[in-house]
Amino acid sequence: MLVGKNITLRLININDLDFLFSVENNIKNFQFSDNPKFYSKEELTDFINNSSNDITTYNQLRFVIEYKKNQIGFIDLFDYDSINKKAGIGIIIDEEFQNKNYGSESLDILIKYSFKELDLLSLYANIDPSNFKSISLFEKHGFLNKEKLLYILKKWD
C-alpha cells in the first residue's frame, strides 16, 4: 500500500471487481483508450485473480486509487522492462473525482515508487493528442512529449 496526503494506492483485489467492471466498460473512457472493448465480469475476474504484487511476474501492476476508503480510479505500471529499467504508466480517475488533484497526487506517489523502490530509470505514457487533461497532468510531473503520442519521464529529469 502506498499512502499519500489524501489518497492511497493499493493493489487490486477481487473486491474491486464491480468498480473495475464499471470503469472498463464505461463508453466515455473508450475515447482515449488504446484498446476500447467491453470486458465481461469473467474476464475481469481472471485478470484480478492473475494479478500479482510482483511486477516481474506479469510485467504490470494495477493499483486502485482510494480517497477516504472509496475507489476513485486506477493507476497502472505496464510493459515493465527489467533490462532497460522502464515501464509504461496509465491512470484513470472516475469523472466525479477529476479536477480535485487526486490524479496528480496518485501520479506523484507512483513516480516516486517506480524510481526509488523499483529502481526504474524511465516511465512513459501513451497519450492521445486530444486528451488535454492527461497531457497537462503528465507534463506537470515532468513528462516530455517525445513523439505524437509518447510522453517520457527519466529518473534524472
List each language-model region with its residue ranges.
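Acyl-donor (CoA/ACP) binding surface of acyl/acetyltransferases
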Residues: 1-17, 26, 66-157
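Short acidic-aromatic low-complexity motifs
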Residues: 15-18, 56-58
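Alpha-helical elements of Rossmann-like donor-binding domains used by nucleotide-donor carbohydrate transfer enzymes
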Residues: 19, 43-46, 50, 105, ...
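Conserved catalytic core of Hanks-type protein kinase domains
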Residues: 22-23
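Conserved GNAT-fold acetyl-CoA-binding loop/helix
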Residues: 28-50
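Sparse recognition of residues in long alpha-helices and their boundaries
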Residues: 36-37, 60, 154
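Short, intrinsically disordered/low-complexity patches at protein termini
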Residues: 42-45, 53-56, 96, 123, ...
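A short helix-loop-beta-strand connector motif used in the catalytic cores of GNAT acetyltransferases and
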Residues: 51-64
